[in-house]
């Protein structure tokens, strides 16, 4: 049972949400009085309550989603809130649906989407993973953060070939190393206000670290938003190469570290928007003609379930007509299908851009 102080904070938060008429978050949409009353006293075995789930969305009324999972059990215990939000965000992943088993498919189906190098500046594919036996950020102790970092360090240190590299803990990082990682756009900063409010940044920078290979095409973030973010990237449009590198890395890491997986929801992550495959395949792409015709851009993006963001990711503008375009769907389809959909969409956008020139 949640304690009285928590429940009174929850009542306050619920009232604030109800009163916020211009709040458009999925939290507000699905946290009805019935659902609220059903869940407000519940507590996971690690001690997480509904407050941990909703506090970021209560504090930041401009959130798109507004909920985070404090631990794996939260997805089950607070399902009356999570399930409809997941269904809404993941476009029809119904509460009776089951996410398919992991399937990276035939990695040779992926190509260089821009062999002439005219449009695509860089290509990146990432996935998130949570380590089994540990809660997500809000419930982690400092000792757990450090223990996880040590496990990740020893796992990554044994990688060989193209994936071989170095691990840099954020704690006690030398200024010159820090600057170098910032210049390479590798260093992650302490979480934004959405993550801060979700208590995702406690004991910072304890237990946080960055690994990258010698070519700087493979990167692992340890304990940023998720326990692990595994990233493969390079300049240009060779999606095939980027995808193959990611798949071999994930397979290698998985041999040594068991990941949290849910029968229905797939791989578990802190934010419900990343569940399932957890895969985000993206390009930084110059589309000057389509940039001037935003409606057409959005129409094609919609057809292939692509998400169009500004150059520096979420909540940013496109600088010089350069967009960050990625697959939007992560659930109810395989890893292969998610990336294939993105490849098809990017090829189509490039074709249209060429026709408009």
From Swiss-Prot:
Keyword Kinase: yes
Top-level class of the enzyme under EC nomenclature: transferase
PROSITE patterns: PHOSPHAGEN_KINASE, PHOSPHAGEN_KINASE_C, PHOSPHAGEN_KINASE_N
Binding site for L-arginine: 64-68, 225, 271, 314
Domain of life: Eukaryota
InterPro entries: ATP-guanido_PTrfase, ATP-guanido_PTrfase_AS, ATP-guanido_PTrfase_cat, ATP-guanido_PTrfase_N, ATP-guanido_PTrfase_N_sf, Gln_synth/guanido_kin_cat_dom
Biological processes per GO annotation: phosphocreatine biosynthetic process
Catalytic reaction(s) noted: L-arginine + ATP = N(omega)-phospho-L-arginine + ADP + H(+)
One Pfam short name: ATP-gua_Ptrans
GO annotation, cellular component aspect: extracellular space
Domain annotation Phosphagen kinase N-terminal: ranges: 9-91
Protein name, as recorded: Arginine kinase
Organism of derivation: Pachygrapsus marmoratus (Marbled rock crab)
């Amino acid at each position: 049972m949640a304690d009285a102080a928590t429940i009174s904070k929850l009542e306050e938060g619920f009232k604030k949400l109800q009163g916020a008429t211009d709040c458009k978050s999925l939290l507000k949409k699905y946290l009805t009085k019935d659902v609220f009353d059903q869940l407000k006293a519940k507590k996971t075995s690690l001690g997480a309550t509904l407050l941990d789930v909703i506090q970021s969305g209560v504090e930041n009324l401009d959130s798109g989603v507004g909920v985070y999972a404090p631990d794996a059990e939260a997805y089950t215990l607070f399902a009356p809130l999570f399930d409809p939000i997941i269904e809404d965000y993941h476009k029809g992943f119904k509460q009776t649906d089951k996410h398919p088993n992991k399937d990276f498919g035939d990695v040779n189906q992926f190509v260089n989407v821009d062999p002439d190098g005219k449009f695509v500046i860089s290509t990146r594919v990432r996935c998130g993973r949570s380590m089994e036996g540990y809660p997500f950020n809000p419930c982690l102790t400092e000792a757990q953060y450090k223990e996880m970092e040590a496990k990740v360090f020893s796992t990554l240190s044994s990688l060989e070939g193209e994936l071989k590299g170095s691990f840099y803990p954020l704690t006690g990082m030398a200024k010159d190393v820090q600057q170098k990682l910032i210049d390479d756009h590798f260093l992650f900063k302490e979480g934004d206000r959405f993550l801060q409010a979700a208590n995702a940044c406690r004991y910072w920078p304890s237990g946080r670290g960055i690994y990258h290979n010698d070519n700087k095409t493979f990167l692992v973030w340890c304990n940023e938003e998720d326990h692990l973010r595994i990233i493969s990237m390079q300049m240009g449009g060779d999606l095939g190469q980027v995808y193959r590198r990611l798949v071999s890395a994930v397979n290698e890491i998985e041999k040594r570290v068991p990941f949290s997986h849910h029968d229905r929801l797939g791989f578990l992550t802190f934010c419900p928007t990343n569940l399932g495959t957890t895969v985000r395949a993206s390009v930084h792409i110059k589309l000057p003609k389509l940039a001037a015709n935003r409606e057409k851009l959005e129409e094609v993006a919609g057809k292939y379930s692509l998400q169009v963001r500004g150059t520096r990711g979420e909540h940013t503008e496109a600088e010089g007509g350069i967009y960050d375009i990625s697959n939007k769907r992560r659930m109810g389809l395989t890893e292969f299908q998610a990336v294939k959909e993105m490849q098809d969409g990017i090829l189509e956008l490039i074709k249209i851009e060429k026709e408009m020139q």
